[in-house]
A protein has these predicted regions:
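Membrane-anchoring alpha-helices and their flanking helix-loop junctions
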Residues: 1-111, 115-118, 136-195
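Membrane-interface loop-to-helix entry segments
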Residues: 118-134
Length: 195
């Protein structure tokens, strides 16, 4: 059986959201270049995240062609849920970046005049842009209708993000002190009420 993401119409929906996500990442990267004031706390976690995301994406797409990992009769509902999660992840990530405004950078860097941001999706979790990434990649795994792809696309990006979250939180506590500690005490990292 041909998976939905390879069928006319459904393939356009999948690839449109997929490409929009990565175009949004590149646009954001260039749009926020001017936000890089001060010294980065570190740079290695960006390499870890990029490596895990790139590795997960390439492996997930390759594994999708493995017929032994298909979801069977549930492929269309699983595909639709995947598209919804991809779109939700894209929107949440961009919303979080907009909420951070000039404080957003691609590396771990606390701006000299930075304050704790608790508006937008930061009202509910400490790292909503990463929540968006997790939702997007889980969505890709589901939309590919392949269990092996889902596992790789859920685990690898999340592993990179866990490294990044640890590094970011250490830098935020060092720079913002008790303000960030109070904020962190009232919000979970990625998912409200979970973690």
């Amino acid at each position: 059986m041909t998976p939905p993401y390879q069928q006319p119409g459904a393939d356009a929906a999948f690839w449109t959201i997929f490409v929009l996500f990565f175009v949004g990442e590149w646009v954001m990267r260039f749009r926020t270049r001017g936000n890089r004031r001060g010294r980065p706390a570190e740079r290695w976690s960006l390499l870890v995240v990029v490596g895990c995301v790139a590795g997960g994406t390439v492996a997930g797409l390759r594994l999708a062609h493995w017929s032994g990992g298909g979801v069977g009769a549930a492929r269309w509902p699983v595909f639709v849920v995947g598209l919804v999660l991809m779109a939700a992840g894209l929107v949440i990530r961009q919303w979080a970046i907009l909420a951070l405004g000039r404080f957003f950078t691609i590396d771990v860097r606390v701006q000299p005049d930075q304050t704790v941001v608790d508006r937008g999706p930061y009202r509910w979790v400490r790292h909503p842009s990463y929540t968006g990434l997790v939702l997007f990649f889980v969505g890709v795994g589901l939309a590919l209708s392949n269990w092996a792809s889902l596992i790789v696309l859920a685990v690898l990006p999340l592993a990179g993000l866990l490294v990044r979250i640890h590094s970011e939180e250490r830098a935020l506590v060092a720079a913002l002190g008790d303000d960030y500690r109070r904020y962190a005490a009232t919000r979970r990292r990625l998912f409200p009420g979970v973690w």
